[in-house]
Structure formats: structure tokens, C-alpha cells
Amino acid sequence: GQRFVFRALGYVTMAKAGLTEVELEDILSLDNIVLGDVIVPTYLKNPLRISHDLVAKLREELEGYLVERQVRNITLMVWANRHLHLIAQKLYLSNEEDVHQMHSLLAEYFLGAWSGGRKKIFTYDNNHFTSLNISHHKNPHHQQSHEKTSSDKYSYDRQTPEQPWVFQCNLLEPDIFFVNHRKMTELVYHLTRSGRTDDLMFGVIMNFSWLYTMIKIGQFDKALTDIDLAYSCTQEKELKFLATTLRCIKVKVLKNPASLSAELQQRLLPVVTSLPKLRH
């Protein structure tokens, strides 16, 4: 359907570094507008996902326009050139409300908000399905008639993955890990553009795991840039204090990242009464 194509190509276009085929399939499975366009209502069941064939067919039809780019051994789908990217922006990302909603959904995906079996509500419009001459789905646990309602709401598992900052093979060896570079690349970008300031503050900037990982992979200055960006979005005084503190301890923690926790506690604990959000 048209909405499937517009959303799919919109997500590829707005992603900071492109998307993998699996990521696109996951994200489209979270998008109720897409599901309402491609899922036959009598097929609604757990888990609720779009067919992999739809994404594969779309890629096949756009061969030469969508190309593969290897980034840290991950294969990402991107437009073949900047001209195509600009055209796609005009075609698929012209509606501000849709763009805001799509950035928010991408942020939820990279936050892992719907992973681990957490179910997301799916609302479908019976009138839309009636116009397609399709009888609407009845939940087996709710046998009462829904004929008088214009829409029904049920929750379904979309089977999207957990999104930790790092993947550890052995919990007994915490220094051996693989960084979730996709989350590192995309999350802050989509949180800022969707205006999800609480998630930006407490899910990222005030998250010790994020800061520690950034330092471990040599991205201390990038972490400071992200904190400054978050401050410009929120004007929260705690963020300004955190950035100042990190600049003061930069030499120490770069020399010994394991000292980060002690250094932060030493400087932040005395001021949590006046800066309460630092407790996070």
C-alpha cells in the first residue's frame, strides 16, 4: 500500500546513518499506520509483525536507488546519492506531524521500549476495513459484538529487540563487550527531533552506562557535545553542571575510565539537594 511505501522510505531517509533491513522490518512492525495498511484484520495475532517479504520486495524494486553501505561490519540501506536523498525528503518527509511521529517511533525502537515481550496497542478502523470489504477481527478473549464501534484496540507483541548500550558475552568479564553502535548513532538524534526531553535526559544523558560506554570507546568529547545539545533543548541546570564536572575530571577518567563512578559521586553528591535531577 501507499502508506507502507511512504513510511518505509521515510524511515530510511530520516535515519541518521541509514537502516539495516532487519531494523526497517522491526520499525515498520511498530508503526500502526503501516500495519493498518498491510495487515488483513482477520490475521491479527501475537506476535504482530509485517511480512519480511514486503521489505525484501521493496528493496528489490528500488535496486540501484537504495544501496548498501558497510559501517562497522553492519550493512545499512541508504540512498545511492545525495540527490535521491533530497528528493526522498521532499516526497516522504513533507508532513511535519508525520515526521515528528516517525522520529518518536525510531527513538522508541532504539530505546528498546517495546522489547522483551512488552505489548503495544494496535488501533484499527473498522470503517477502513469495511471499505476494503473485509470483516473486522474479533479478539477470541472478547466475544461481544464490536459492530457499534468505529475502532478496536488490542495490544500485541511486536517482537523488537532489546537495545542495551553494550552487548556482553560473559557477565563475569565485564571489560569484554561489543558496543551497540546503532543505538549510539541514532538514539540522541531522534530523541532531540521528536522533543522527547525526559527520555533524552534520563534515558541517555543521566544514564551512567551511556556515559561510561562513550568514555570507554574514546568518545568523551562526543558525550560532552551530546550533553550540551541536551542542555540547549531542555535548559536543565543539572546538565550544565554535569558538563562542567566532566570537563574538570576529563584527564583522570580518560587515564582510568573505571574511576568515573567515584569521581562523579565525589562531585555530584554534595549538590544533589540543589540539583535533584542529578540523583538519576
Question: What are these language model-derived features?
Answer:
Residues 12-17:
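Short helix-capping/hinge SLiMs at alpha-helix to coil transitions
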Residues 22, 69-86, 204-222:
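Accessory beta->alpha helical hairpin/"wing" motif in late/C-terminal subdomains of nucleic-acid enzymes
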Residues 20-22, 36-37, 88-89, 200-203, ...:
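Intrinsically disordered, low-complexity regions enriched in proline, serine, glycine
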Residues 112-280:
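Extended acidic/polar alpha-helical scaffold segments
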Residues 20-28, 264:
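A short acidic, leucine-rich amphipathic alpha-helix
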Residues 4-11:
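Short alpha-helical "packing" element that flanks the helix-turn-helix/winged-helix DNA-binding module
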